Structure formats: structure tokens, C-alpha cells
Amino acid sequence: MSRVGKNPVSVPANVEVRLSGSEVEVKGPLGMLRHELVSDISIERKGESLLVKAADDSKHANAMWGTTRALLANMVKGVTTGFEKRLILVGVGYRAQAADNVLNLTLGFSHPIAHKMPEGIKVETPSQTEVVIKGMDKQQVGQVAADVRAYREPEPYKGKGVRYADEVIVLKETKKK
């Protein structure tokens, strides 16, 4: 029995959900998201909410029950408010600049890095050391943020690198004689 799966997903008035066979389509003010359902899962509409049900008591069906419910909730939130990840660049000369759909990074390498954003992802740079990645798809926003962070992960001695805004870097102590 899934504790997450048995909770209904509330659908706001400005969101339209279309169930067709094994596909769910969620349309809202920010756009549209589509998800392919697993055969062990069914979705039932009850008024202003969606109920996710497992077809049987198999281990796979129970595992996918909570997962599908969480994915649906994220789709509804994504098309209404969207998701965002904030990155902070810490280091001398580390800079970021957003131009159209490309994020230009200077991270202490001998060359600048131009990271092209995928479809549906927007990037902003409120300051030279701050990057904001926005989009409807939670997984895609997180993946792009992880890709940008991977260019220069925070090092453990001074904390220099690209980090998430809410990330705490535990610094190591330097060796003493």
C-alpha cells in the first residue's frame, strides 16, 4: 500500500487534464506536459481531483503507484507555477551570462563554456554570479542544473565552484605539520 499513491492529486480550475488510453496530458497556463502510463496503473477522475490506482498487488504495481501520483502532481504544478533552480558561482573571475537560449560560463578554464538550453527551459542571470533555471518539467530543470553544476563542482577546501543556492558545502581542514 503506497502512502503517497493513495493521496488524490488536486487539479486547479485553470488546468485541463486529458486521459486517453495509456497517456495523460496536462495543459495549463504555462504549457502542456505529456506522460505515458505504465500498464499496472490506472487514473480515475473524481470532481476536481485525480485518483491513481494500482491494477493489482504486485511489487511493480505498488512501486509505480506512488511514483505515478508524484509525477502527476509535479506535472500539475509545472503547468501552473513551474519549477526553478538557483545556482551560485563562487570563485574569483567566475561569471555567468545568459544570451537567448545559451548560458555562457567563465569558470577558470582556458576557454569559456557555452551551455545550450534544451526546449522548454529558460535561463536568467540576475547577477554575474547567480543563475536561475526555469521550466515546466521538474526532471528537466533539475537535470540542466546538475549539468551546469558538473562543469565545476564545489571543491572541499575553499568551496569554489558552481553550487545550488540552498546547498551547504562542508569544508575540509587543510593539513597541518
Swiss-Prot record:
Example of a GO biological process term: cytoplasmic translation
Family annotation (InterPro entries): Ribosomal_uL6-like, Ribosomal_uL6-like_a/b-dom_sf, Ribosomal_uL6_a/b-dom, Ribosomal_uL6_bac-type, Ribosomal_uL6_CS
Pfam families tied to this protein: Ribosomal_L6 (PF00347)
Annotated Gene Ontology cellular component terms: cytosolic large ribosomal subunit
Entry-linked Gene3D superfamilies: Ribosomal protein L6, alpha-beta domain
Domain of life: Bacteria
GO molecular function: rRNA binding; structural constituent of ribosome
UniProt keywords, alphabetically: Ribonucleoprotein, Ribosomal protein, RNA-binding, rRNA-binding
Entry's family note: Belongs to the universal ribosomal protein uL6 family.
Described function: This protein binds to the 23S rRNA, and is important in its secondary structure. It is located near the subunit interface in the base of the L7/L12 stalk, and near the tRNA binding site of the peptidyltransferase center.
Subunit structure: Part of the 50S ribosomal subunit.
Name of protein: Large ribosomal subunit protein uL6
Species, as recorded: Nitrosospira multiformis (strain ATCC 25196 / NCIMB 11849 / C 71)
